[in-house]
Amino acid sequence: MQKQKQELHRGLEERHISLMSLGAAIGVGLFLGSASAIQLAGPGILVAYAASGLVMFFIMRALGEMAIQKPVAGSFSRYARDYLGPLAGYLTGWNYWFLWVVTCMAEITAVGIYMGFWFPDVPNWIWALSALVIMTGVNFLAVKAYGELEFWFALIKIVAILSMIAVGLLMIIAGVGNGGIATGISNLWNNGGFFPHGLKGVLLSLQMVMFAYLGIEMIGVTAGEVKNPQKSLAKAIDTVFWRILIFYVGALFVIMSIYPWQEIGSQGSPFVLTFQKVGIPSAAGIINFVVLTAALSSCNSGIFSTGRMLFNLAEQKEAPQAYGQLTKGGIPGKAVLASAGALLVGVLLNYVVPAKVFTWVTSIATFGAIWTWAIILLSQIKYRKSLKPEEKKQLKYKMPLFPFTSYVSLAFLAFVVILMAYSPDTRVAVIIGPIWFLILLAVYYGKGFHKKNAAAASERNIS
């Protein structure tokens, strides 16, 4: 048995982590999930994205404050352990693993929907299984090669979004693709007003809007594999937030200006529908390919995250020790395979309930994400309070307007959970989420993890 501590390789650069986080966040939440969110809120969805984006900015700043001072793999699980206690770290680590498994189920479900554009007679589950096998293989590449591939995956999405925004603006302003007749932006208020379903519609859309931001915290997961984390993480956090906000709000502004919001259905991506409206039907296939790569990319990031989180849990002796083993290339191979194995449930759901699986899994993933984001905020509050006055002055990357922004962000997250319980479509998440935590608690106390942690704490105090 090898006794020396195995470590993940620091092979990721700033451009990799910026684009990986961007790639993880810009997945089916924007390309497919935005359709159902638009139906709930109409053009008022722009307000929901902007407000949620501001809260996500504060959450990312809270994570950055800790990650820049203490960059480790599986960062927020480790911070929860250090500042909120071993149980919080255990729950957060396993919860993050679970939420990305569920998120990847949404992504591979989307792969099936997008492939149906070309192959309508092939069942969704076949494409879901194919995507899972391919993305698992990609995760066995050396971390630098993986980062490079994900960089280009994300770049394809970004170019597509910017192209769509540019073409859409030309149609809005100059009527390009619409017989020279400028569409203007009157569609934003001509079809029942800017808030056609009132404030209630905007509030009910928040679950899908928050799901669209899931993945932005990936920067924290990469902290243990980043070169020069102090410099890279700060820049990546700031740039990723603004890019995502511009892409989301900008893209949806163009979509709803060109296309009456009530005509944007859930039969396919709003991006494909938008290009068809512009008068370039041949572009629909290209855009469908782009959104297909978006789903694959986000699933790719998810398998990356789950593997690293299992590795971290194994290091803490709260997951099977085999998951703490690395391949020669520095990849937590067994942890990656275990995560991919769990994703087979998503393939099964695509076979059994293909019509309902997307809404179910996005709701459950959002619930898990809200726990993670809340833990980041609570850890940062405890972390800041634990610092001596001189240490607070030395912080290189501070949470702005602390503690006000931390508590307001926590209240916002709690409000979204209440809304999820209110809506019949998303209520399943508020039922399954607590059941999952009860299972984790049963394992924690049943396996005696609480005694091991107490013994370890007492040893540290003695030494």
From Swiss-Prot:
TM region positions: 17-37, 40-60, 97-117, 122-142, 153-173, 201-221, 244-264, 278-298, 335-355, 357-377, 401-421, 429-449
GO process terms (BP): amino acid transmembrane transport
A molecular function (GO) term: amino acid transmembrane transporter activity
GO CC annotations, alphabetized: membrane; plasma membrane
Membrane topology field: Multi-pass membrane protein
Keyword entries, A-Z: Amino-acid transport, Cell membrane, Membrane, Transmembrane, Transmembrane helix, Transport
Family of the protein in this entry: Belongs to the amino acid-polyamine-organocation (APC) superfamily.
UniProt-recorded name of the protein: Uncharacterized amino acid permease YtnA
Organism, scientific name: Bacillus subtilis (strain 168)
